[in-house]
Amino acid sequence: MKQKYSKKSKKWIYITTIIFILILDISSKRLIIKYIKTYDTKKIFSVLNFFHVHNHGAAFSFLSDQNGWQKWFLSTVSILTILVMTRIITKLKKQETKKITAYSLIIAGATGNLIDRIFYGFVVDFIDIHINDWHFATFNIADCSIFIGIIILMRINYST
């Protein structure tokens, strides 16, 4: 009896993590849309700006210069990623918490960016990290979630 409760509570931890990241991602993007005009910048710290930009492509604006087909392609890739990662999680042993966490983070990020593509036709990016005049690619919380999930998976795969 106790083991079933433990297994269910662990599932809820991962589901709650996904929901929390989605709420954080969607809320932050809505605030950016509401308070910062497109292509405007708000300085937060010396190395951090909020720069409101619309990304019609993938990471690093890959495919953003295409004529619209990329929205459907990237949405399909996101849906397949979410489905595959969910299937992988259901096949993992409950003791593989690091892998489940990593896949949950990737699912949350892919879902956040998919929601943007469906509702806006693009992904809202706003986190601008820079040193003087050098700026890293602008990103969002969903991108951070995907990145952290990938880093966790890489550490798991390369530490054994």
From Swiss-Prot:
One of its GO terms (molecular function) is aspartic-type endopeptidase activity. It is a multi-pass membrane protein. This is Lipoprotein signal peptidase. It is found in: Cell inner membrane. Its main location: membrane. This protein specifically catalyzes the removal of signal peptides from prolipoproteins. The gene is lspA. The keyword Cell inner membrane applies.
